[in-house]
Amino acid sequence: MVPHDELLRLSSLCYSTSTFEIDGIEVLVTQWDKYSVVAVRGTQMSWRDIFRDARATPYKSELLGWGHKGFLVAAEKVLQRLSIMSSIKGPYVFTGHSLGGAIALAASYGAWKRGWDVRQMVGFGTPKVFYRESKKLPLEDIAYTLYENGTDPVVKVPMFFGERIVKPQKIGKKKGIRKLIPCVNDHLLSSYEESLSKEPP
Protein backbone atom coordinates (compact mmCIF):
# COMPACT_ATOMS: atom_id res chain seq x y z
CA MET A 1 0.00 0.00 0.00
CA VAL A 2 1.03 3.61 -0.52
CA PRO A 3 2.02 5.42 2.72
CA HIS A 4 -0.54 7.97 3.85
CA ASP A 5 2.01 10.78 4.13
CA GLU A 6 2.91 10.21 0.47
CA LEU A 7 -0.76 10.36 -0.51
CA LEU A 8 -1.11 13.60 1.45
CA ARG A 9 1.89 14.99 -0.46
CA LEU A 10 0.28 14.03 -3.79
CA SER A 11 -3.05 15.51 -2.66
CA SER A 12 -1.17 18.76 -2.07
CA LEU A 13 0.81 18.53 -5.32
CA CYS A 14 -2.30 18.21 -7.46
CA TYR A 15 -3.29 21.77 -6.50
CA SER A 16 -0.42 22.95 -8.72
CA THR A 17 0.28 20.03 -11.09
CA SER A 18 -2.16 17.85 -13.02
CA THR A 19 -2.13 15.08 -15.60
CA PHE A 20 -5.51 16.11 -17.00
CA GLU A 21 -8.37 18.52 -16.41
CA ILE A 22 -11.99 17.87 -17.23
CA ASP A 23 -14.76 20.39 -16.58
CA GLY A 24 -12.59 22.18 -14.01
CA ILE A 25 -11.64 18.95 -12.20
CA GLU A 26 -7.86 18.61 -12.06
CA VAL A 27 -6.39 15.14 -11.59
CA LEU A 28 -2.80 14.02 -11.05
CA VAL A 29 -1.99 10.44 -12.05
CA THR A 30 1.39 9.08 -11.04
CA GLN A 31 3.12 5.79 -10.38
CA TRP A 32 4.22 4.77 -6.88
CA ASP A 33 5.91 1.39 -6.81
CA LYS A 34 3.39 -0.92 -8.54
CA TYR A 35 0.40 1.36 -7.92
CA SER A 36 -1.23 3.95 -10.17
CA VAL A 37 -2.16 6.79 -7.83
CA VAL A 38 -5.07 9.04 -8.81
CA ALA A 39 -5.04 12.29 -6.81
CA VAL A 40 -7.95 14.73 -7.27
CA ARG A 41 -7.55 18.44 -6.52
CA GLY A 42 -9.64 19.91 -3.74
CA THR A 43 -11.70 23.09 -3.68
CA GLN A 44 -10.22 26.32 -5.00
CA MET A 45 -11.88 29.71 -5.11
CA SER A 46 -13.61 29.22 -8.45
CA TRP A 47 -17.31 29.37 -9.26
CA ARG A 48 -17.15 25.85 -10.69
CA ASP A 49 -15.76 24.40 -7.47
CA ILE A 50 -18.15 26.36 -5.26
CA PHE A 51 -21.11 25.24 -7.39
CA ARG A 52 -19.89 21.63 -7.34
CA ASP A 53 -19.56 21.69 -3.53
CA ALA A 54 -23.02 23.24 -3.16
CA ARG A 55 -24.84 20.70 -5.37
CA ALA A 56 -25.73 18.55 -2.37
CA THR A 57 -29.11 17.52 -3.74
CA PRO A 58 -29.49 13.73 -3.46
CA TYR A 59 -28.90 12.34 -6.93
CA LYS A 60 -29.07 8.80 -8.29
CA SER A 61 -26.19 7.75 -10.51
CA GLU A 62 -26.68 4.55 -12.48
CA LEU A 63 -23.13 3.51 -11.55
CA LEU A 64 -22.75 4.97 -8.06
CA GLY A 65 -26.25 4.99 -6.56
CA TRP A 66 -27.62 7.81 -4.39
CA GLY A 67 -25.35 10.61 -3.23
CA HIS A 68 -24.18 14.21 -3.48
CA LYS A 69 -24.89 15.29 -7.06
CA GLY A 70 -21.84 17.53 -7.46
CA PHE A 71 -19.43 14.82 -6.29
CA LEU A 72 -21.02 11.92 -8.18
CA VAL A 73 -21.21 13.76 -11.51
CA ALA A 74 -17.57 14.83 -11.12
CA ALA A 75 -16.49 11.26 -10.27
CA GLU A 76 -18.23 9.92 -13.38
CA LYS A 77 -16.30 12.42 -15.52
CA VAL A 78 -12.98 11.45 -13.92
CA LEU A 79 -13.67 7.75 -14.53
CA GLN A 80 -14.63 8.47 -18.13
CA ARG A 81 -11.26 10.13 -18.75
CA LEU A 82 -9.26 7.48 -16.87
CA SER A 83 -10.92 4.69 -18.87
CA ILE A 84 -9.47 5.99 -22.15
CA MET A 85 -5.94 6.53 -20.82
CA SER A 86 -4.25 3.33 -21.97
CA SER A 87 -1.00 4.22 -20.20
CA ILE A 88 -2.62 3.88 -16.77
CA LYS A 89 -2.59 0.38 -15.33
CA GLY A 90 -3.74 -0.93 -11.96
CA PRO A 91 -3.68 -1.65 -9.17
CA TYR A 92 -5.21 1.74 -8.38
CA VAL A 93 -5.06 4.03 -5.36
CA PHE A 94 -7.35 7.09 -5.07
CA THR A 95 -6.74 10.11 -2.86
CA GLY A 96 -7.63 13.76 -2.39
CA HIS A 97 -8.33 16.60 0.03
CA SER A 98 -11.74 18.20 0.62
CA LEU A 99 -13.69 18.21 -2.68
CA GLY A 100 -10.90 16.07 -4.14
CA GLY A 101 -11.35 13.48 -1.40
CA ALA A 102 -15.09 13.29 -2.10
CA ILE A 103 -14.57 12.82 -5.83
CA ALA A 104 -11.82 10.26 -5.17
CA LEU A 105 -14.09 8.34 -2.78
CA ALA A 106 -16.90 8.13 -5.34
CA ALA A 107 -14.48 7.36 -8.20
CA SER A 108 -12.81 4.55 -6.27
CA TYR A 109 -16.19 2.90 -5.77
CA GLY A 110 -17.15 3.38 -9.41
CA ALA A 111 -13.82 1.99 -10.61
CA TRP A 112 -14.27 -1.08 -8.40
CA LYS A 113 -17.80 -1.60 -9.75
CA ARG A 114 -16.36 -1.56 -13.27
CA GLY A 115 -13.97 -4.33 -12.34
CA TRP A 116 -10.81 -2.28 -11.90
CA ASP A 117 -8.25 -3.47 -9.37
CA VAL A 118 -8.67 -0.76 -6.70
CA ARG A 119 -6.65 -1.38 -3.53
CA GLN A 120 -6.74 1.80 -1.46
CA MET A 121 -8.53 5.12 -0.98
CA VAL A 122 -7.33 7.80 1.46
CA GLY A 123 -9.16 11.10 1.93
CA PHE A 124 -8.26 14.18 3.96
CA GLY A 125 -11.11 16.42 5.16
CA THR A 126 -13.57 14.55 2.95
CA PRO A 127 -17.23 15.63 3.09
CA LYS A 128 -20.02 13.06 2.96
CA VAL A 129 -20.64 11.54 -0.46
CA PHE A 130 -23.28 8.81 -0.32
CA TYR A 131 -26.84 9.36 0.90
CA ARG A 132 -27.87 7.43 4.03
CA GLU A 133 -25.53 4.54 3.29
CA SER A 134 -27.57 3.70 0.17
CA LYS A 135 -24.40 2.19 -1.25
CA LYS A 136 -22.10 0.01 0.81
CA LEU A 137 -18.45 0.50 -0.04
CA PRO A 138 -16.44 -2.68 -0.71
CA LEU A 139 -14.57 -2.57 2.59
CA GLU A 140 -13.35 -6.13 2.09
CA ASP A 141 -11.59 -5.21 -1.17
CA ILE A 142 -10.45 -1.60 -0.74
CA ALA A 143 -8.56 -0.18 2.25
CA TYR A 144 -10.47 3.04 3.02
CA THR A 145 -9.12 5.73 5.36
CA LEU A 146 -10.82 9.10 5.82
CA TYR A 147 -8.92 11.52 8.05
CA GLU A 148 -10.66 14.11 10.23
CA ASN A 149 -8.35 16.78 11.63
CA GLY A 150 -9.29 18.46 14.90
CA THR A 151 -12.76 19.95 14.60
CA ASP A 152 -12.80 20.19 10.80
CA PRO A 153 -16.46 21.00 10.04
CA VAL A 154 -16.33 19.88 6.39
CA VAL A 155 -16.29 16.17 7.24
CA LYS A 156 -19.74 16.56 8.86
CA VAL A 157 -21.56 17.91 5.79
CA PRO A 158 -24.04 17.48 4.27
CA MET A 159 -25.51 16.70 7.70
CA PHE A 160 -28.78 15.34 6.30
CA PHE A 161 -26.88 12.52 4.54
CA GLY A 162 -26.84 10.55 7.79
CA GLU A 163 -24.01 8.44 9.21
CA ARG A 164 -20.83 7.86 7.24
CA ILE A 165 -20.10 4.50 5.69
CA VAL A 166 -16.42 4.77 6.63
CA LYS A 167 -15.83 6.25 10.08
CA PRO A 168 -13.20 9.03 10.00
CA GLN A 169 -9.81 8.48 11.59
CA LYS A 170 -9.27 11.41 13.94
CA ILE A 171 -5.97 13.28 14.11
CA GLY A 172 -5.03 16.61 15.68
CA LYS A 173 -7.40 16.01 18.57
CA LYS A 174 -8.25 19.00 20.75
CA LYS A 175 -8.93 19.15 24.47
CA GLY A 176 -11.45 20.89 26.67
CA ILE A 177 -13.90 23.36 25.21
CA ARG A 178 -11.90 23.59 21.96
CA LYS A 179 -13.02 20.11 20.92
CA LEU A 180 -16.63 21.36 20.81
CA ILE A 181 -16.01 24.33 18.51
CA PRO A 182 -15.79 23.72 14.73
CA CYS A 183 -12.64 25.32 13.29
CA VAL A 184 -12.31 26.01 9.56
CA ASN A 185 -8.52 26.24 9.93
CA ASP A 186 -8.51 22.54 10.82
CA HIS A 187 -9.71 21.86 7.26
CA LEU A 188 -6.65 23.45 5.66
CA LEU A 189 -4.31 21.04 3.90
CA SER A 190 -1.41 22.51 5.87
CA SER A 191 -3.22 21.60 9.12
CA TYR A 192 -3.61 18.01 7.94
CA GLU A 193 0.09 17.93 7.05
CA GLU A 194 1.06 19.20 10.50
CA SER A 195 -1.22 16.78 12.37
CA LEU A 196 -0.27 13.74 10.30
CA SER A 197 3.44 14.48 10.80
CA LYS A 198 2.87 14.38 14.57
CA GLU A 199 0.58 11.34 14.51
CA PRO A 200 1.72 9.05 11.69
CA PRO A 201 -0.64 6.11 11.04
Model-derived segments and spans:
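Non-catalytic, mobile gating and regulatory segments of ester bond hydrolases
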Residues: 1-95, 99-201
